[in-house]
């Protein structure tokens, strides 16, 4: 069965969600979060993706990005996986895939929807009852 086509438009914000396989932890230590964020910063510049919001939960990632080209998001997520997964596997003495299939994405065409995505992403740790206030969660753009 063929995969559904991914529609990403240049200069239009995209909400990206990537889950850990079987919802296992993708980040176990503070160093894991820092390495992922370092790769995200470097690769977003390389692939011309403006990162507006992010939240790194223990078993999944939310990003709100605006790609410079139709291929930018896919290239960003591909290279994040190519850099982060080998690091994570080496660090935690494991093998195999870390992510559950392809990342999910949703185009945020209107300003109203972009703001809703910001709120959704940055309030994720509060909804998960990990913190009382979004500024208390160190692994999101809110902090």
Model-derived features: positions:
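Short catalytic/metal-binding and nucleic-acid-binding patches
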Residues: 1-143
């Amino acid at each position: 069965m063929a995969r559904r086509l991914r529609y990403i438009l240049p200069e239009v914000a995209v909400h990206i969600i990537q889950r850990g396989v079987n919802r296992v932890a993708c980040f176990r230590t503070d160093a894991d979060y820092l390495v992922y964020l370092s790769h995200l910063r470097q690769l977003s510049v390389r692939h011309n993706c403006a990162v507006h919001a992010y939240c790194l939960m223990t078993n999944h990632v939310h990003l709100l990005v605006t790609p410079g080209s139709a291929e930018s998001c896919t290239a960003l997520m591909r290279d994040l996986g190519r850099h982060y997964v080998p690091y994570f596997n080496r660090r935690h003495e494991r093998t195999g895939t870390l992510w559950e299939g392809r990342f999910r994405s949703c185009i945020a065409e209107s300003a109203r929807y972009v703001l809703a995505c910001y709120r959704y992403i940055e309030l994720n740790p509060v909804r998960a009852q990990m913190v009382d206030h979004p500024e208390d969660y160190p692994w999101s753009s809110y902090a």
